[in-house]
Amino acid sequence: MSDLIKIIDQAFEDRANITPATKGEVVEAVEEALSLLDSGKRRVAELGDNGEWVVNQWLKKAVLLSFRLTGNAPMNGGYDKVPLKFTNWSEDQFKQAGFRAVPGAVVRRGAFISKGAVLMPSFVNIGAYVGENTMVDTWATVGSCAQIGANVHISGGAGIGGVLEPLQAGPVIIGDNAFIGARSEVAEGVTVGEGAVLSMGVFIGASTRIIDRATGEIHMGKVPPYAVVVPGSLPGKPLPDGRPGPSLYCAVIVKTADERTRSKTSINQLLREAQN
């Protein structure tokens, strides 16, 4: 593994000279890295023994290098550099994978979908990881290298940002049992803690202030576990002429998820039977 990482790190430093004409060990290393991601054997970010997420930068570099190594080619319904994950899959492969993908769901190769997951017509980008029994609802997007935990619900039209463009240092991470409300957006490497609930239309980036209404504590870049978050606003500074200034968007923690909240956002096991 150390040799693989070394080859990818060195190639990334010389990425300006990497083209579809490149041959040899670089191509083989990137292909092996993408296969590891596609099979779920390795992840762009992994939870360490200390409970902190560790980003495997070499895998993210491999994803970026793959765009330099591959030219566009015709594919069913498109013309792109990245093949689709399910191309030429047999019924047996789908059964073995153990998840459901509704027609219209688009998953790029290099993304991993765990058993029991349900993909409505949605988009899952290269390098992403979708955990067991997670629902990615209609028109939702899971961005490049995003890490989605188990028993998560990504509601309709929600967006989970990627790392490729604009280039981000770390992926978005959604913890187990979290709920992302319809049309919400989580981007720029933000971590959403286990069991957190984002209501409809919450937008959180790295610089978004997440204010705990009960304590006044301000979080940035991380939603605490089991926090229930809604859109809010901060009073603006007065304008030079003394008039009230425009308010600024923020996210507000209104409470900690209780049993009633969890029952409203819980996984419907009737929808998770992939073999039926």
Swiss-Prot record:
The keyword Transcription does not apply. Gene3D superfamilies: Hexapeptide repeat proteins, Tetrahydrodipicolinate-N-succinyltransferase, N-terminal domain. It comes from the Bacteria. CDD domains: LbH_THP_succinylT. Signal peptide: none annotated. GO terms for molecular function: 2,3,4,5-tetrahydropyridine-2,6-dicarboxylate N-succinyltransferase activity. Pathway: Amino-acid biosynthesis; L-lysine biosynthesis via DAP pathway; LL-2,6-diaminopimelate from (S)-tetrahydrodipicolinate (succinylase route): step 1/3. Keywords: Acyltransferase, Amino-acid biosynthesis, Cytoplasm, Diaminopimelate biosynthesis, Lysine biosynthesis, Repeat, Transferase. It is found in: Cytoplasm. One of its GO terms (cellular component) is cytoplasm. Its EC number is 2.3.1.117. Pfam families: Hexapep, Hexapep_2, THDPS_N_2. NCBIfam families: dapD, PRK11830.1. Belongs to the transferase hexapeptide repeat family. This is 2,3,4,5-tetrahydropyridine-2,6-dicarboxylate N-succinyltransferase. It comes from Zymomonas mobilis subsp. mobilis (strain ATCC 31821 / ZM4 / CP4).
